[in-house]
Amino acid sequence: MAPGAGLYVFKVLDYLGMGQTSDSIRALKYIKENCVRLNIKILNFSVGYLPCSDTAERIKILKLIDELWDMGVVVVAAAGNYGPAPFSVTVPGISRKIITVGSFDDIRSGKGPTDCCIVKPEILAPGHDIISLGTRDGTYVRKTGTSMATPIVSGAIALLLEKNPNMRPEAVKLALYNTCD
């Protein structure tokens, strides 16, 4: 989608898609310490944690995500797949600041409002039967969920920043709002 974009990949999940919040915290701290040097403009966070467990670690994730946003990194997070009930958006998608992505073609897509009455997700993208890499043998597989929808929005943002490299995250979010139907 954005062939001129460079990528840094941070592994926070195992081959089964399972992970610890501590792995995400470690990756987020590294990104925070190195985002200027590495010229990281967008953080695609296709991982979600339920807000009700490991509260202290989830608060750390939210704090780091918000700090990255304040430093000028556009943070795009998956809404999670615990919907369609209200209050089902996962951490870090519940952050007031960041852009949270749901899947318009998956009924399990996380849905707001958050417990702080924030309307989430802000944007929807395709997330059903998306062709992706397999984890075991490098073949392609079909995957479904908000983790598949989130990179589509991140790619669109990369194109926007290619033309407007000095846009702040707030302006990027507003541009998305103003162009969505």
Task: Go through the PLM ranges and name each one.
Residues 1-22, 36-41, 94-97, 113-120, ...:
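Subtilisin-like serine protease catalytic core
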